[in-house]
Amino acid sequence: MTVPAARSGRKVYFIGLNAVPFLPLVAGLLRTYAEQDPRVAAGYDFQEPVFLVDGVQEMAAGITDPDVLALSCYVWNFRRQMKVARLVKERHPGMLVVAGGPHVPDRPGDFFARHPYVDVLVHGEGETAFRELLIERLADHPDYTRVPGVSVRHGTEAVPGRPAERLPRRIETPSPYLLGVMDGAVATCRQRDLRFYALWETNRGCPYSCAFCDWGSATMSALRLFDAERLQEEIEWFAEHDVEDLFVCDANFGILPRDLEIARALADARAATGAPKLIRVNFAKNSNDRVFEISKTWHDADLLMGTTLSMQSTDLDVLEAIDRKNIGLENYRKLQQRYATENIHTYTELILGLPLESPRSFRDGIGSLLEAGNHEDIRVYEFGILPNAPINTPEKIAGYGLRTVPKRLYVEEPGTPDDEAETVDMVMETNAMSRDEWVDCFGFVQAVQFLHNGCYTRYLSMYLRQRHDIGYTAFYERLQQYFGARPDTVLGSIYLRMRKLYHDYIDIPELPLANLVASQPDMAADLARYGKRRGWTIDNWGWLRIANDFERTYTELRDFVAALGVDDTSDPDLAEVFRFQQDVMLRPDYDPAAGRTTEYTADWPGYFTTGELRRRPVRMRLADQRFGANGRYTPVPGDLKAFARAAIGPSYPVSRIGHYRHRFEAAEVTSPAEPVLTEQR
């Protein structure tokens, strides 16, 4: 099936901007659903969607003779799209401007007074409302209040339309992929040599109503399904068109029994054609056997970006405040062990600044996740207040003392006006956490992310926990205190620079949420040798700073551990643990062709794999050839750009799979008396 040839008719334009190239699925779904009606198909000429970010003036100039301009609004694109709409409306005052998406407020309030160039707001699901708007526009005297699920501008006031209509439980909309509607966007990305992501829905809806999220309310909660035959044909389309990166947009993939069959079909396509290569997905909130089987299927097929074991917080009072039910720490521990047994990468997401979360509960929560076995990937996000999130009411904001700061999302070019700079209201203070405590908590987070998740102190801290009963929270709190008082040390200078940056981040509106490091000349200079990228994160910066002062850092860490009461006199194994910790780190001079060999008086590779220490001499041969998900990155001795790609990976998507260190669990471990084999792993 192919998209109909271009024809004369009223021009319809879509805008849905993303900093990362996502194929414009929303535009495709709205178009294919609307064109089922012969009046729409005959009366309108749909233009290629605008989905790649460009200058506002340039985007506006590219919209010629529009009759309808549709905006898919998110927190990351709202202001730019509004300005494009305003500029185009000034040239074409008779066109219809329709705004939909999660950033369109359910309660319009003074929206039309602030944005008088917008004519109609679509609330929630858009297919039915958009089709009916297009049909109504063909009338001699259109009355958009006849359309379901909209608010219509009347002067500066909002007049509601009819009650919203949603698609049925079995969603039978045409596929924009199978009809060829997405072909133009794919061609554009490939012509510009852009790594792009195909967005894909298998179901729609979310049965949860977490207070910080607008997904459940936006999708009206009930789960509705796309046809299984259509999904199989779309999988075949992705494979035939060599779509490497797939983003499954479901809110809870794995919640339905059929999701395992969908996962297997994707794995089969990967095995048969090589595509897709990587899948990003929002797994079901309460992980279950099905999510495990899906994860194992994709792990075995080399498709998995990691499995989420959801938390947001480990504190029960916090979870109650945000209407969130979690799996519990004991179940979390069992799941973590189950995934680890199969070598499946998991990650856990927390949010800093949630209602009732104190500095102590937050730090102890991270420590409890480490105690449960999540040593590879703990991700912490700031708490942004979304327009339609259940918590966004005056009563709840005041009741929890949520004090926000409007933050820019991106590093903007000098002179970028405020009405083009995307912002989000970030919670920087609550009744339970002051601003200084918020800063200290983020410093603690970064220490865990680039030292523990990033492996520099992971095995050292595991050893101290197991042999000396120094808990993870205590280890990283004391590390933060020790080096924070020693600015001349490597870690001290890193920590204090991070602390200053977070204070500046609160106080300076222009400092952005994303690409924060790129806004700091001194940090950018530190990273220049590793290649140019806007997406360096703070933990990337910290990790590479240590890579540049590797030996000195470990000398200073030995002094810190001695301050904890553990030294070579009290623990004869400590020196070898330090050496093992250093040996497993990926270094700029590593040569995959040669590998590395090291010897120990005890089986430390086995100890950090099984927890059991065997007192026997061993030789460990490290022969890793490639790093990262799919083994995409090969280090080259002395090539710092190749080193950074192998050690850290790309800026997007964030993945800690296969980075930072050698896979000693798969290394060749023998007795020093045995000959060394040469096979590479």
UniProtKB/Swiss-Prot annotation:
Residue sites binding 5'-deoxyadenosine per the record: F212, Q312, E349, G384
Catalytic activity: (2R,3R,5S)-2-(S-pantetheinyl)-carbapenam-3-carboxylate + AH2 + 2 S-adenosyl-L-methionine = (2R,3R,5S,6R)-6-(methyl)-2-(S-pantetheinyl)-carbapenam-3-carboxylate + 5'-deoxyadenosine + L-methionine + A + S-adenosyl-L-homocysteine + 2 H(+); (2R,3R,5S,6R)-6-(methyl)-2-(S-pantetheinyl)-carbapenam-3-carboxylate + AH2 + 2 S-adenosyl-L-methionine = (2R,3R,5S,6R)-6-(ethyl)-2-(S-pantetheinyl)-carbapenam-3-carboxylate + 5'-deoxyadenosine + L-methionine + A + S-adenosyl-L-homocysteine + 2 H(+)
The enzyme's E.C. designation: 2.1.1.394
Binding site for [4Fe-4S] cluster: C206, C210, C213
Taxonomic superkingdom: Bacteria
Annotated cofactor note: Binds 1 [4Fe-4S] cluster. The cluster is coordinated with 3 cysteines and an exchangeable S-adenosyl-L-methionine.
Cofactor(s) essential for the protein: [4Fe-4S] cluster; cob(II)alamin
Domain B12-binding: start-end pairs: 1-144
MF-aspect GO terms: 4 iron, 4 sulfur cluster binding; cobalamin binding; metal ion binding; methyltransferase activity
Alphabetical GO biological process terms: antibiotic biosynthetic process; methylation
Pfam families referenced in this protein's UniProt entry, alphabetically: B12-binding (PF02310)
Domain Radical SAM core: 192-417
Binding site for cob(II)alamin: N18, S72, Y74, V75, H103, G126, E127, D214, C249
Pathway membership: Antibiotic biosynthesis
Swiss-Prot/TrEMBL induction comment: Part of the thienamycin (thn) gene cluster. Expression is regulated by the ThnI transcriptional activator.
UniProt keyword terms in alphabetical order: 4Fe-4S, Antibiotic biosynthesis, Cobalamin, Cobalt, Iron, Iron-sulfur, Metal-binding, Methyltransferase, Plasmid, S-adenosyl-L-methionine, Transferase
One GO CC term on file: cytosol
Iron in keyword set: yes
Protein's job: Methyltransferase involved in the biosynthesis of the beta-lactam carbapenem antibiotic thienamycin. Catalyzes two consecutive S-adenosyl-L-methionine-dependent methylations to build out the C6-ethyl side chain in a stereocontrolled manner. In vitro can use methyl viologen and NADPH as the iron-sulfur cluster reductants.
Protein family per UniProt: Belongs to the methyltransferase superfamily.
Protein name (Swiss-Prot/TrEMBL): 2-(S-pantetheinyl)-carbapenam-3-carboxylate methyltransferase
Source organism (scientific name): Streptantibioticus cattleyicolor (strain ATCC 35852 / DSM 46488 / JCM 4925 / NBRC 14057 / NRRL 8057)
Lineage, top ranks: Bacteria, Bacillati, Actinomycetota, Actinomycetes, Kitasatosporales
Gene that this sequence comes from: thnK
